[in-house]
Amino acid sequence: MLRLLTRSQAFRAVTLCQRPIISSRCIPIRNFQISPILAKKNKAKGGNKNKSEVQEIEEDNTDNQVPEIDFDDATNKFKGVIERFSKQANEAKLGKTSPNIFDKLIVETANGEVGFTSVAQTTVKGRNFMITVFDPSNVKSIINAVLGSDLNMNPQIDPSNKQTLKVPLPPLTTESKKENAKQLKLVYERFKNGSGRANGSLATIRGDVKNKFQKQHKKKKLSDAEEKVFKDFEKLHKQYTDKLTEVFKSAEQAILK
């Protein structure tokens, strides 16, 4: 019996040794939750901070931006001025020998007043203007329109064609040449310095670009970068002003020779 008791005690000892040992130190765990109100406040606080930072960045970027000038657009407009003046300069060189001399006349027809170009067209043949009348019923009306103008010309019906009027070209005199040159200079000044958008002068285009440029920056004094941009535009304006002057002088010499 003593042997059985010993075995029982040994088995109990082994069993006790195999049981897991639980530490006596306990760390309490607490579930942490953020209330909706606190979360909203934290989000709002962070949002305001980000918004402020973005605003500062945008202000810095605005300060660093250099006002821009559309050089392509300005160049195209300057070219348009040169082209329009060149056309008028060519007409001035022809003076009263230009076939367009009658184009602005108003003709009184049976259907009322109409423009010259709607009832006739003009060409130059030798030392004569040849006016072709579209409707024979308007021949007399066109003759009266020419006689009533300040052109000092006397159209005659061509015997070989009743719908054709022959008008001798006026002789070119020194006085008429000087007058043509004077009129051309007035046109030149209008295309160069004329005011008003309707005139489309180089000065008007420059003024529009300058005003738009100045509105893009709020500082009274231009920065170095801004100064460079505007100086480049001023060079472009001068370049086309010189071109306009060249066209004028060339046409003036052709008129006076």
Curated annotation (Swiss-Prot):
Compartment(s): Mitochondrion
Protein name, entry field: Ribosome-recycling factor, mitochondrial
Family, as annotated: Belongs to the RRF family.
Organism: Debaryomyces hansenii (strain ATCC 36239 / CBS 767 / BCRC 21394 / JCM 1990 / NBRC 0083 / IGC 2968) (Yeast)
Transit peptide among keywords: yes
A Gene Ontology cellular-component term: mitochondrion
Highest taxon above the source species: Eukaryota
Gene Ontology biological process terms from the UniProt entry: mitochondrial translation
Pfam families: RRF (PF01765)
Main localization (coarse): mitochondrion
